Amino acid sequence: MGKGLEGTAARCGLGMGYLLHSVVLPALAVLGASRPGSAAQDDDFFHELPETFPSDPPEPLPHFLIEPEEAYIVKNKPVNLYCKASPATQIYFKCNSEWVHQKDHVVDERVDETSGLIVCEVSIEISRQQVEELFGPEDYWCQCVAWSSAGTTKSRKAYVRIAYLRKTFEQEPLGKEVSLEQEVLLQCRPPEGIPVAEVEWLKNEEVIDPVEDRNFYITIDHNLIIKQARLSDTANYTCVAKNIVAKRKSTTATVIVYVNGGWSTWTEWSACNSRCGRGFQKRTRTCTNPAPLNGGAFCEGQNVQKIACTTLCPVDGKWTSWSKWSTCGTECTHWRRRECTAPAPKNGGKDCEGLVLQSKNCTDGLCMQAAPDSDDVALYVGIVIAVIVCLAISVVVALFVYRKNHRDFESDIIDSSALNGGFQPVNIKAARQDLLAVPPDLTSAAAMYRGPVYALHDVSDKIPMTNSPILDPLPNLKIKVYNTSGAVTPQDELSDFSSKLSPQITQSLLENETLNVKNQSLARQTDPSCTAFGTFNSLGGHLVIPNSGVSLLIPAGAVPQGRVYEMYVTVHRKEGMRPPVEDSQTLLTPVVSCGPPGALLTRPVVLTMHHCAEPNMDDWQIQLKHQAGQGPWEDVVVVGEENFTTPCYIQLDPEACHILTETLSTYALVGQSITKAAAKRLKLAIFGPLSCSSLEYSIRVYCLDDTQDALKEVLQLERQMGGQLLEEPKTLHFKGSTHNLRLSIHDIAHSLWKSKLPAKYQEIPFYHIWSGCQRNLHCTFTLERFSLNTLELVCKLCVRQVEGEGQIFQLNCSVSEEPTGIDYPIMDSAGSITTIVGPNAFSIPLPIRQKLCSSLDAPQTRGHDWRMLAHKLKLDRYLNYFATKSSPTGVILDLWEAQNFPDGNLSMLAAVLEEMGRHETVVSLAAEGNY
């Protein structure tokens, strides 16, 4: 009724006095008369209204200084609602579209001393009974209507609800037993209540504050997460829900952090316990590293080990019997002897005591004395001379033997040098020709190419894999060229054989292309085709490297308020920038840097880059690596093994990966094949010269990782070389089966062309392809036409993995001397925009995004919140990452923006929201003109 009256007054231009006297008062009288027993009350109501009202004074519309606030009735206590407006002659409350009787109003009027305007303040009291008597889907509400001579003003609606908090928790925490440093999740869903209950956690009846103890984290769903369980975290945990009505406690959940026992190191072996004969030695260990705690498992195994030992018994020595006395000597003595061998002392036994020799006089002291003879002196002199002569002869013989041995050793050195094929160091004599008994064998059916083998030979003896000098050399590259004829190739024809594999290159072309390599390597450092940069503030934006599949999404709010960052994203193409990989590992993405390093971000950015893996997680172990500055490459996270402390989240789509991170650095994705069924995608691209004035025509077959940047690099390289794309590139699934890649050419018109490859096919070794670390890997097929009048080449090229998949290219090339123009259908000429700043970078308008976040961030009892949104968008592989963010919905929408850039599939998003029952958001999308 009030709305109709006000509308009438506004349309007719009537004063408020006339409106109240002619319309409002009679209507109120009729309403009063319709209620029995209320006549006297209505008379009082009319008497209290003023007799006259001022008409059309120059006053403004009423302005509310105080508007009614939402209130909750606790138990049976009524609540008061207040309104205050100026200038206002009257203020009345309207509750649930019905006017509140004047007698229920408490009115206070005064005149503002400063402005001279009437200030009116009114309050009413709402009881529990009034709220309970209301029927219908809408809650009990009241609003104020203020009058002045200029018109009426309505306040906002204030809802009055009966506060309550149910006793039963919807989900209570459960006790757990966990090992040390394990992540613990305690779930809690508070009981239903109005207003919504606040949740806190108690540990042994003390409130947990995650700010003080960062090992605890309370999610937006009220769950408690213990990041790494400690022994001190063994306690009783209680979930507490409270509002203005009551405080409820859940059942206590006991968390026990146990420690499994671990063995200490073994002690040294003890000495053998037997001093003589068989015994044993032992060593021990204890279950104290660590000792089991809180029910942890005891160490498995024995704590004592014993081994048999044998200690030899000591044997004391004993004398043998004395020998017979010797004959009487010239000095009138004779002697006898004995030995300590019956038995000899062993194993530490005692030695014999006493004399070994015993002598005594054999003539009873009657011994003759003879004068010295001069013959004895001559005898002694002769003996000395003989000894000296023997020593001299020995020295001469020794010198002769030494010289003979030295000469033979020198001959051995000369002989060994002959085995080097004639490449002797300086100052060493040439080898004797008679030592080259066996000539080199040139009858093998395969010719091998290895870079280091030909370091001392002429360049013409090499069998190159490619004739393109602009490409970086491939170290230790080996290619087998299989000859079907099996004929022996003479040594003097080796140079001609190698020249048949690739065309001759003039010296001037070689020098020019070498110069191009140098210029290109310098240009790569600042190549704008590999880098995008821009200046961003808190509004965010998007950096895109055209035609490379690499971009960086900076969400709104990622850059702190009030700061401006010069940000960039770049692709590194130098092989030295790539992470080292092991035999079974492969590089799946380009190496991408984003910066500036160390920049403070308040929410994750999304780094997007193409990958070449067939993402079957049963066959792969995929991990993200990063490099800080010039330091070593470090592991960040293994996909599928994330935990609460993981700093990044990886969304792996069929062709691209999206990395959510708050750390700007250098990143790359590395895969390790678990089974031989693991496969990576290769992009096969075939190029030929734009114009050809010679008889030779070269076809280059590139085998690249199936990423946009790898193909873009080759297209740029061929453009510089004057090459053209001969056929649409094709994809090949290359399995980790260790089988090589085989390339062959077929169906050549032999009357017009001949192949200069003296083999049936070429092969690229498996690991050269699988590692993903060799850029621009390719093979060259050289054909020769018999006449310059031949202007067309028709043939087939087959590329396949041995015992695997393959692709066939049907080539129909035009060969002419004049350039026909280069067409690169892969290069998107429209993709020149690299930087988008502000709201234009995002598909979802900011107001709708804010509305989505405010409605989906809060957990819902039916689950119609951000978790369902992640599930519907297939982004629910690891929900705990989003749960740790202040706005999980915002991070999910950031990831959706990166996935659907640049088209922005809003129709799909609207359909998902429609399924979730978010009709108002779908209507908002339609109103924005984006749906």
UniProtKB/Swiss-Prot annotation:
GO terms for biological process: axon guidance; dorsal root ganglion development. Residues 161-256 form the Ig-like C2-type domain. SMART domains: DEATH, IG, IGc2, TSP1, ZU5. Residues 402-931 are cytoplasmic. InterPro entries: DEATH-like_dom_sf, Death_dom, Death_UNC5C, Ig-like_dom, Ig-like_dom_sf, Ig-like_fold, Ig_I-set, Ig_sub. The keyword Signal applies. Disulfide bonds join 83-144, 95-142, 188-239, 272-309, 276-313, 287-299, 328-362, 332-367, 340-352. Residues 260-314, 316-368 form the TSP type-1 domain. Residues 850-929 form the Death domain. Residues 62-159 form the Ig-like domain. This is Netrin receptor UNC5C.
